[in-house]
Amino acid sequence: LDEQKGALRWGNLMATLGWRQQVDSVRYGQANLFVTRYHMRASALSRNSYGEPNTSTYQASVSESVQSNNLLDVGLRGSLEHRWAAHRWQGGFSWTLHRYCLEATLSQSSNLSANLENPTQRSFSNQQLWTHEGVLYGEGDFRLSPTVRMSGGVRLALFLVEQKGYVGIEPRWAMMWQPFPGVHVQASYARQHQYSHLLSESYINLPTDTWVPSTARLRPMRSDQGTLSIGYEGVHGCHFSMEGYYKQMRNLLAYKDDFHVIGSFANWEEKLTVGKGQAYGVEWLARKEARRWSASLGYTLSWSDRQFAEIDNGRRFPSRYDNRHKVNLTFSQKLSQKVELTAAWTYSSGNHLTLSVENYEPANPVIPSRWQMDGYGRLDSWLPNTYEESLNAYGRRNNYQLPPYHRLDIGLTFYRPMTKGRMGIWQVGLYNAYCRMNPLFVIKDERRANCYPLVNTPGQSDVYRPVFKQVGIV
């Protein structure tokens, strides 16, 4: 008898206190004090039993695990903007205190058998880390001639963690040329450092990933991206553009192939390996704007891969989000001065995940521990057992691609003018309006790998369809 249950909760909270000041006709300043909090809590319960009760072969196990990830940011940022003629300059600063609750894990289990009197094991691990991030930046936008415009800037960042400091210099540059009226050609380059890493140990499209910071052992991620685009601003509100891009990434983090063997309560840094990646592609966009309606159609053809010395023998493999084709279609219609109808349809090639290509029966029927997938597509384990089970043999990393993902979102927006020039906005809508059963997880048996959407199994009292009502107030 096997029974598995899972639950997932996540959310964001944000509060901001702002100040704005018009210094004079050409200078403008602002400052903001902000607090943000992200939290995620995933729990899994597993019950397993084998053999006949009250016999020497009977075994039963109950295992429960809870994982949570929390990120708290408190910071201050300010900027000053100066405009003159056709030029603009802006400079500013920011300081942020980060608190990471890295892997708050609670695990408890019990075992029943003919030879044991219900032993219980409980474990708890909670790792916190505080970091500081300071930024100074300056940028300008200048018109060099009637047909040439250039913008550029530099961002200087300081990140302090575990008595170690990282300094990042991030130049940015872009130039636009208008050879003909309505036609522009643009090239750009940007370098970025990222001090927070998003680690993924599952393939499902839910926020089960973990935010971790750069540390004294793990350097910040660095990326360099270049783009080249051409656009056309046509008559009657028609716009067309095409852009090619290439992005190179260094100091990427990923879980090792055998990270689950290290144990749930080991230092999280020991489970990671450092590598590199690249992403490139071409994007097309067509947009039409009329007096009471607007529509846009976008298509992206892209590639993305990763390379780690300790994963897949150092060979390149497709990233989780190596979605070859993406289509976005949007439409909005003003029904009146106070009501607007919106619709958005999205299509994407499926994400990648790793599935075993072969299964073997073990030579020794005594298995030290059973490794399995929990309710969120992550590797998990439970108490030792003595039954025979097949072993998985994996090929390349991310060797399986899920079916395509698509959905339609529909919404209504109500505008209500208020006093002192303010505007109240109410929003209602449907997420996944035509109830597309997009794959959520995969269960593999001896013959095939089956994809399952976000729907409870038959026979349960409540059936959750992947259609959600949305209500918002701005």
Locations of regions flagged by a protein language model:
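Gram-negative outer-membrane beta-barrel transporters
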Residues: Y246-Q248, A266-V357
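Surface-exposed extracellular loop regions of Gram-negative outer-membrane beta-barrel proteins
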Residues: W177, P181-G226, Y246-E269, A344-N359, ...
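Outer-membrane beta-barrel channels and translocator barrels
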Residues: D24-V26, W84-H87, S145-R149, Q178-G182, ...
